[in-house]
Amino acid sequence: LGLAAGACSGNGILFDITDPRAPERIDAVSDSGFAYWHSATFNNDGTKVLFTDEWGGGTRPRCRTYDPLTWGADAIYDIVNGKLAFRSHFKMPAPQGETENCVAHNGSIIPVPGRDIFVQAWYQGGLSIIDFTDSANPVEIAYFDRGPIDDTDLVTGGYWSTYWYQGRIYGTEIIRGIDVFALTPSEHLSANEIAA
């Protein structure tokens, strides 16, 4: 692959690391809707990068009906001739309440051959499993949401990150511990894809 990507607070960058002792910055992108470029993840074959925006630092409700859909979201870029080409934003579709801190944070790729699937932590927004195989049209194919920690007061909590490991998804919940999930076949994901 010979590439590295970074989310650098104010922008996203792409490096050529063919020579690890002399990395070369080959592209940088910015997005007026992104407040804090937080993480960068390649798809399975290194042809796309998914960046997250931790708008508000993860401590405020940012997934309400009136919050912009491009803020606190994911930005998906294809890598075309060594350059980052913007394709789309994705933000969880289920609105959250005033007592739920919610914004894109950390996540990981679910390795399904021929597809680009990402499990995204949204703090108290729970987790989304996003199919971004079509970079311009990402879609949520599964989700889990525990609901607010407190119905009357904002308490910072929720999923810090979600990890795929040996057929399971691990959600590290700041207040309530760890949740472990198994994917089940659906119209969006076959048993063979899950087993791959």
Label every model-predicted segment.
Residues 1-196:
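Feature marking well-ordered beta-strand scaffolds used for ligand recognition
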